[in-house]
Amino acid sequence: MKPRSKRLLLVAGAVALLVGAVALVLNAFQQNLVFFHTPTEVAEGKAPVGRAFRIGGMVETGSIRRAADGVTVQFAITDTAKVIPVSYKGSLPDLFSEGKGAVVQGTLGPDGQFQASEVLAKHDENYMPPEAQHAVDQAQKAAQTVQQ
């Protein structure tokens, strides 16, 4: 085999390996990518059914219900415009309470019930995840526009 052919074969092999590595990285990234949606977007059907994503907003006052098993909790997340029912099996963060900001990650069932696999509570009086704050602001603006 001539040196030129060897070089060409080596370059082609290196390009093939590089393309394969990039494809594997992109595939892994896509599988771990979790999108954020507001309760309004979820209620309007803009969120994927059966695929993991996050919902952020406020825990609706009076919505927390604990099951007899002591592990399952049901509550609702709202952006003041729409309300999404959430079911979570596990222990909730200490800062989780009604009327406070929260972000839940999980999947939306065909019945519209959000099955959370993770619950994140806001950290202090002044903190709210930027996406959740934006969603609440947008919902309040929309509600004011409708009232006028």
UniProtKB/Swiss-Prot annotation:
Key word S-adenosyl-L-methionine present: no
Membrane-topology annotation of the record: Single-pass type II membrane protein
Parts of the chain on the Cytoplasmic side: 1-7
Segments passing through the bilayer: 8-28
Keywords: Cell inner membrane, Cell membrane, Cytochrome c-type biogenesis, Heme, Iron, Membrane, Metal-binding, Signal-anchor, Transmembrane, Transmembrane helix
GO molecular function terms listed in the Swiss-Prot or TrEMBL record: heme binding; metal ion binding
Record InterPro entries: CcmE (IPR004329), CcmE-like_sf (IPR036127), NA-bd_OB-fold (IPR012340)
One GO term (biological process): cytochrome complex assembly
Residue intervals on the Periplasmic side: 29-148
GO terms under cellular component: plasma membrane
UniProt signal peptide: none
Subcellular location: Cell inner membrane
Cell inner membrane is among the record's keywords: yes
Binding positions for heme per the UniProt entry: H123, Y127
UniProt record similarity statement: Belongs to the CcmE/CycJ family.
Protein name, per record: Cytochrome c-type biogenesis protein CcmE
Organism encoding this protein: Aromatoleum aromaticum (strain DSM 19018 / LMG 30748 / EbN1)
